[in-house]
Regions:
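N- or domain-start disorder-to-order transition segments that initiate the globular core
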Residues: 1-29, 33
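Hydrophobic faces of well-ordered beta-strands that scaffold small-molecule active sites
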Residues: 19-25, 40-44, 107-113, 138-142, ...
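C-terminal extensions of enzymes
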Residues: 292-358
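Active-site beta->alpha loop and helix N-cap motifs at the rims of alpha/beta catalytic domains
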Residues: 39, 48-51, 56-147, 151-152
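Catalytic alpha/beta core domains of metabolic enzymes, predominantly
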Residues: 161-292
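Glycine-rich tight-turn/loop motif centered on a GG-T
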Residues: 56-84, 159-163, 186, 214-229
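Generic hydrophobic/aromatic pocket-lining and core-packing "Φ" positions
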Residues: 31, 128, 149-152, 173, ...
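Short, surface-exposed connector motifs at secondary-structure boundaries
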Residues: 13-16, 132-138, 154-162, 242-249
């Protein structure tokens, strides 16, 4: 595959810093353009998959009708998830040359485990292994919940490269990073290969911003609103420091963009940034001059504001929450509910194809 690169800040950062660019979409046309910006990976989740299917209804609605005939005993959900598999594999194929060139560190397509399995560690690990076996460059998303922590370690032990998701806090990042490390060490103790595994731990920086803004409004806190744009940035930088200090091999990944700092503040770190395509295009079309900012602390006055918010402190401190508390954190609940709704929307889309309203 020959890539015609598009000059711009993203390409500059990709070529001149350790920071890897992924694309927060598995739509093949968007991914192809993102590769020209220097992208070396892609992510997907139920919401993204549903959006991608709707963007190419001319392709996927007829395919849903075909699958209904090929799978006469399948449920709406099973047909919908087969479409997700096929969509993901189409995108994964575009990334295979990068995967081979980088020995598995990049060139991966993220598939997400079914959010309806979130209560069972075994079901999550089993589905992660199934997705892992679909293509050599699949990485599998598992949520940073109390159940997910167990599934993350087990899936890693089975050889699955995991992308931790539904993660908003330093505590979630560190806890899941350590779970990945335990899984890797268990494999290595048994002489099993880990050389091509490329785990990442996502921190959904924009969704943390969203949640802390909600809390500040709910609690009628008088704050500089501009400072709240830095919640995710501050947490991500803290988590990155903890990973370095603890020697965790998984890379941090920045996702859920709300502003350009969710890329620019992390440039220079050995991390992954995964903007949606519209954000990637906005950044690459700009005249921004790339500067390595990963190790530059958030300003003291901003941190003073953020640390006055108890909910932010929970997200910022490495021991700010227990795994059981991950499950009830506002960002976790809101995001899982959103993913479950996207699953329900996909079911409804399949239903409209195979049983259109009269």
């Amino acid at each position: 595959m020959s890539i015609e690169y598009t000059p711009g800040p993203l390409l500059d950062a990709a070529r001149n810093t350790p920071t890897a660019l992924w694309n927060d979409s598995s739509d093949p046309s968007e991914l192809a353009q993102s590769l020209s910006f220097g992208s070396v990976g892609a992510t997907c989740n139920p919401t993204i998959a549903y959006t991608c299917i709707n963007q190419r209804r001319d392709v996927w609605l007829p395919r849903i009708a075909e699958l209904a005939k090929e799978m006469p005993n399948a449920t709406e959900s099973e047909i919908g998830w087969q479409v997700v598999r096929e969509l993901s594999l189409e995108a994964a194929k575009l990334l295979e040359p990068i995967f081979e060139a980088e020995n598995g560190r990049n060139g991966r397509l993220s598939m997400q485990t079914d959010p309806r399995l979130a209560r069972s560690a075994k079901a999550l690990a089993d589905q992660a292994e199934e997705f892992h076996n679909l293509a050599k460059n699949i990485i599998v998303k598992i949520p940073a919940t109390s159940v997910g922590v167990e599934a993350i370690e087990e899936a890693t032990y089975r050889g699955v490269s995991v992308n931790v998701t539904v993660s908003f806090s330093v505590a979630q990042a560190v806890t899941t990073g350590e779970a990945i490390e335990r899984g890797l060490k268990r494999r290595e103790a048994e002489g099993k290969d880990t050389s091509q595994m490329g785990p990442v731990v996502t921190l959904m920086v924009g969704r943390l911003d969203d949640w802390i803004k909600e809390v500040a409004a709910r609690d009628k806190m008088f704050l500089d609103p501009g400072h709240l744009e830095w919640c995710g940035v501050a947490a991500f930088k803290r988590a990155y420091q903890e990973f370095q200090k603890r020697g965790l091999r998984a890379r941090m990944l920045s996702a859920a963009f709300r502003n350009v700092m969710h890329w620019s503040e992390f440039v220079g770190g050995d991390v992954v940034v995964s903007p949606p395509f519209k954000w990637a295009k906005l950044i690459n079309d700009s005249d921004y001059k790339v500067e390595e900012r990963m190790d530059i602390p958030v300003r003291e006055d901003i941190m003073k504001t953020l640390l006055s918010i108890p909910e932010f402190v929970r997200a910022y401190e490495p021991d700010g929450m227990t795994p059981e508390e991950f499950d009830t954190f506002g960002g976790t609940v809101r995001t899982l509910r959103g993913f479950l709704q996207a699953d329900a929307d996909l079911d409804a889309l399949v239903r409209d194809v195979i049983m259109p309203a009269p």
